[in-house]
């Protein structure tokens, strides 16, 4: 569906212009854009400008200049992209992304995630397995909601050089963690540094290996 269509017989390409709406029934993929090009030879769809894609009523993707390969069922873009799922998680991908919709794996250079509890996670060189809820990445930073550890006056943050997380546990390496209030934003009261940090989500336990505590501007 579109206001205007142009078919190039020589190159076997169909261009759809303005108010474009495409529903791929075989793949259960819905696309909205103002300019789409369907390449029959390559079996690909390329969008120019803002694009909305919905997959299986599970994922909603907002991006620009997207490539949809119908053979491999891969979506990609070099532009900033936001993906929302039906579990209220929001994935913000900077500098583009690649989404293998069959394996449900997303790769991105820079990733920001806001989970359903409103905690914020930042990664670099990330791979996300949406089937298993596994995330692997580098340069992790987590901004927890202030009340995450039971005190709304806290400002809990955690950072690490690399990380792995799934439904059962989160493991972060070379970690810096603090729950101290940062009213003046100039310096934390304390921070805990660890070679390895593990959060057992089932047992609700935190484990630290090779750790040391730093206290700032305090007399002990």
Segments the model singles out, each with a brief description of its role:
Residues 1-220:
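Structural signature for solvent-exposed beta-strand/loop edge elements and short helix-capping sites
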